[in-house]
Design a protein with these regions (language model features):
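Metal-dependent nuclease catalytic cores that hydrolyze phosphodiester bonds in DNA/RNA
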Residues: 1-88, 117, 135-139, 167
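A substrate-engagement module of RecA-like helicase motors
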Residues: 115, 237, 243-244, 296-405, ...
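Alpha-helical scaffold elements adjacent to nucleotide-binding pockets in ATP/GTP-utilizing enzyme cores
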Residues: 168-171, 214, 287, 312-320, ...
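Conserved pre-motif I regulatory segment
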Residues: 232-273
């Protein structure tokens, strides 16, 4: 039997496993503007580099277990390597035991290594320009992996890279070193002010063994989440296989179920118009769930314009769970409605749930997903209070482990608030959208995109 595939991006991995500290939105800029400017800054910096600099390099690491294959993938902002492309870009499967894999010289380049750890550069070097060499800690200049970050912060106040930015660069550096048989490699975190275009660069050298120890430790922390995902997906798929339509079909209902399933199977679009009370919600949710069980879709997004229709969707999934379905659903509630505080001030000084949120959230989530299948507002509030975390942020995070997300149109279509964790890049996931009362999208769309 073919192994299950579990995929996560490099950024998703480090942001999930290594996050810590407080929620603090006091210094956050408008995300849509920052994203547009960030893309421009990336291209500007990448285009200014020399011929040995290669932008947007796709990298992939795969670890095989007895039950599933775990893939960590992403694109390095830049790699500076004069031997680029001379060795295979495919990572050999690793063993789940975590045994170190010896790097093999794949390009004929000279392999060199400092004689002791005291010879390496133990602190960050702040490079003045993109072409300046840092203090030599190895016999020859190593390959460099560049992580570019746009920011509105005063660069003079940045004394060292943020942990998560450094971690992304280290992941890409490890995968690239493993693929290309490198004993050492350099990472660089490049900060560029989005207003002034001023740059500040931090560089650091690593032995391959150092990166491997660090990377395998990160994977070890993610292991329980991957194990859980695999086990849950197996149980979910088996329950879907045995699931039958809960009632005798009404007139025309079986045909509707068939149309919906065929639409999903052939990856088409279907517009449905039918009177109230004919069972449209059940007739669309049931075949959608079946499609997930047959791997025709990875996740269902049930999009609505009204709270009452979100309740109908929750009741429909609850009905199917009552018939034996194992299927996790999350209902996203607006921050203003679910916040525990009188005023929505998301910073550690104003909100005790924001203070230390990221130190506690992963334990809270694991407690939640291993004890509940419905992540509705009432249950979210219960677990958020139990673990003293922000209920709104917890709700968003639980969507990562939900089989269906019930939410307002905004979370899919509004450029200001859409779920970037799912829709910001081409993740390769196959999402299924059930849009209730789609005629409302016209007016809502005008509101979302109005200047």
């Amino acid at each position: 039997m073919e192994k299950a595939q579990i995929r996560i991006s490099v950024r998703g991995l480090v942001e999930f496993i290594l996050r810590s500290g407080d929620i603090d939105n006091r210094h956050v800029q408008s995300p849509e503007n920052a994203m547009l400017e960030g893309g421009r800054i990336h291209r500007m910096i990448q285009n200014s580099m020399g011929s040995y600099y290669h932008a947007e390099v796709s990298l992939r690491y795969q670890m095989e277990t007895e039950r599933y294959a775990l893939s960590i993938e992403g694109r390095a902002d830049g790699i500076e390597d004069r031997f680029f492309g001379m060795s295979s870009m495919e990572v050999p499967p690793g063993e789940i035991s975590g045994e170190k894999r010896s790097a093999k010289n794949g390009s004929g380049r000279k392999k060199t290594k400092a004689t002791s750890l005291s010879e390496r550069l133990d602190t960050w070097t702040v490079a003045k320009t993109t072409t300046q060499m840092t203090t030599q800690s190895f016999i020859e200049q190593p390959v460099l992996v560049d992580e570019i970050k746009g920011t509105y912060r005063d660069l003079k106040k940045i004394k060292e890279p943020m942990l998560l930015h450094e971690a992304q660069a280290k992941c890409y550096a490890y995968i690239y070193a493993l693929q290309n048989g490198l004993d050492n490699i350099r990472i660089r975190v490049t900060y560029c002010n989005l207003d002034t275009e001023e740059k500040k660069l931090f560089e650091k050298d690593f032995f391959f063994e150092e990166l491997e120890d660090w990377f395998l430790e990160v994977l070890a922390q993610y292991r329980k989440w991957a194990d859980y995902t695999c086990e849950w997906n197996e149980k979910r798929t088996e329950s879907i296989r045995q699931l039958a339509f809960p009632y005798p079909y009404r007139e025309g209902q079986k045909e509707l179920v068939t149309y919906v399933y065929q639409t999903i199977y052939h990856q088409r679009k279907l517009f449905i118009e039918a009177p109230t009370g004919v069972g449209k919600t059940l007739s669309t949710v049931f075949p959608s769930v079946k499609a997930v069980g047959e791997h025709k879709a990875d996740k269902i997004f049930y999009l609505t314009a009204k709270t009452i229709t979100r309740t109908v969707a929750e009741e429909t999934f609850a009905l199917l769970r009552g018939r034996g379905l194992l299927f996790k659903t999350v209902t996203l509630t607006a921050k203003e409605k679910i916040c525990f505080c009188e005023e929505v001030e998301c910073n550690p000084e104003a909100c005790p749930y924001a203070r230390g949120h990221f130190d506690r959230i992963n334990d809270a989530m694991y407690d939640f997903i291993t004890h509940e299948d419905s992540f509705d507002r009432e249950r979210v509030e219960h677990y958020a209070r139990k673990h003293q975390v922000c209920p709104f942020e917890m709700c968003l995070d639980m969507s990562l482990f939900a089989d269906a997300v019930i939410c307002d149109y905004n979370y899919a279509f509004d450029p200001h608030v859409y779920l970037r964790r799912f829709f910001a890049d081409a993740s390769g996931q196959n999402y299924l959208f059930l849009i209730d009362e789609a005629h409302n999208l016209v007016d809502r769309g005008r509101e979302m995109y109005s200047a």
